[in-house]
Amino acid sequence: MDHHQSGTRPARRIALIGTDFDGTVFAGGDTMVSAEHYRAFRRQLQHLRGAFGTHWAVVTGRHVSAMPLLLNELLMHGLSPDFMVMEDARIYRRRGSRFRPFWWWNFSIWLRRRRQLARHRERVRATMASIQAEHPTAVSMGGNRMIDLWYEFDADGAAVAVERRLLDQFAGESDFFVFRWGREVCLAPTAGTKGEAVRRLASELGAHRREVFTVGDGQNDISMLDPVAAGLIACVANAQDEVRIAVERAKGFIASGQHIAGVVEALHFYAQKKA
């Protein structure tokens, strides 16, 4: 039997598993991933939950409105997280069949982000007006959410062009970072990172950082792939160069497998490695 599928008791306690979604747990696009990798991950979760009461959090930059879609995609593989962290830092905990927000935590994230945006309000609005004029078919994804400048474009080229423009325009800014998911591009306030959310969850669970496992592939994952947030750090083989560098610097594990296969590999590495 494959070692990822074995029922042996894990050698190390892992209290919290924090995984990115796009590019990590799910490949997206036309990339084909074997269902066996998801079955292996489900078995790992079952073993860890049975042995240590381990909790699993999906930590994603996706809008809160995308939560039902993500949960359905996970459910198709028999997976159900204990927490959903949306827009990098907004925390929701599973209660029965529903996910309930961490009201005060989420409000504090909202307030900090609004203050950051307020300091650059005119500049951000001018940039949004320019983007809308140049790309009239772009769909604004911001609305009343925590991030104003968030667009979905109808072509990859347009998204890449706007991403590059924002990177140049806001280079060196400590209040913002630029991120792109396929055809979606956002200018995100730096307040409320994935790393902060993971630390908040660890505190909620009474878990020491040495009992926290995190894995990702993209730039906005770097804050949780940091020894300040987690002691068991990993990235999948398809991770961006900046992410691999961050994991190497943290003396973490770089998987040879891509997407969920890499998650299974990294989790097995740490679960069977004595503390």
Give the residues covered by each predicted segment.
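Asp-based phosphoryl-transfer active-site loop
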Residues: P10-T31, L225
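Basic, amphipathic juxtamembrane/active-site segments
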Residues: G29-L48, A234-A237
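Active-site phosphate-binding/coordination module
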Residues: R39-E134
